[in-house]
């Protein structure tokens, strides 16, 4: 149950017609531009033990793009990017499910020697890949919307900047999140294994490039 259903409602996720469930969906209901808290509680019908937690509903103050790397290699698997949102106190929101974002690839004015291009990077749909995203992302893609998680793939070498903006009008003053990505050639050294040399001996290395699944 929720102590303040007008702030955060709770819906059991179990068999139809049953009030008891081990899982539940908590949804933010408040539309007020202020920080509000509701107490979510669950009771074990056998032992009477009560579990509780606070559900804090607040406005987003800042967004950031989170990535495992800033470098992509041509011919590599797509890179998954995700948005983290923070409140005014720096706390991270638990979920951004359902929020619509506008992701765009823009030119990078600070390429620092890299070829700057807005066509070096391509945004992919999860529906076009073998990746399995959260179910709400797939539902948003079906209606041509973008959520807090996307895939990107390198098209050609260079540097590109990716920008993400919240579409909700209430967040028009929240600065877009940006991330700079570098797309590099997939270069290999042959031989690829460790070499142990005697003093005075040498070994010849060859540089090879992976292109369209073939080494050239």
Name the predicted role of every residue range.
Residues 1-216:
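Extracytoplasmic soluble-region selector
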């Amino acid at each position: 149950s929720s102590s303040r259903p007008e702030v955060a409602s709770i819906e059991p996720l179990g068999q139809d017609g049953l009030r008891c469930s081990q899982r539940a969906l908590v949804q933010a209901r408040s539309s007020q531009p202020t920080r509000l808290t509701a107490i979510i509680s669950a009771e074990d019908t056998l032992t009477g033990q009560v579990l509780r937690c606070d559900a804090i509903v607040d406005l987003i103050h800042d967004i950031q793009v989170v990535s495992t790397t800033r470098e992509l290699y041509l011919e590599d698997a797509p890179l998954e990017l995700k948005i983290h949102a923070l409140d005014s106190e720096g706390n991270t929101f638990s979920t951004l499910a359902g929020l619509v974002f506008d992701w765009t690839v823009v030119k990078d004015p600070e390429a620092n020697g890299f070829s700057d291009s807005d066509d070096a990077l391509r945004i992919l749909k999860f529906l076009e890949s073998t990746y399995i995203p959260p179910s709400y992302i797939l539902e948003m893609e079906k209606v041509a919307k973008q959520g807090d998680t996307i895939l990107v793939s390198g098209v050609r070498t260079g540097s590109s900047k990716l920008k993400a903006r919240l579409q909700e009008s209430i967040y028009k003053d929240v600065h877009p999140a940006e991330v700079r990505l570098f797309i590099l050639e997939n270069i290999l050294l042959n031989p690829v294994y460790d070499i142990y040399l005697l003093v005075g001996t040498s070994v010849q290395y060859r540089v090879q490039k992976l292109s369209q699944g073939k080494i050239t």
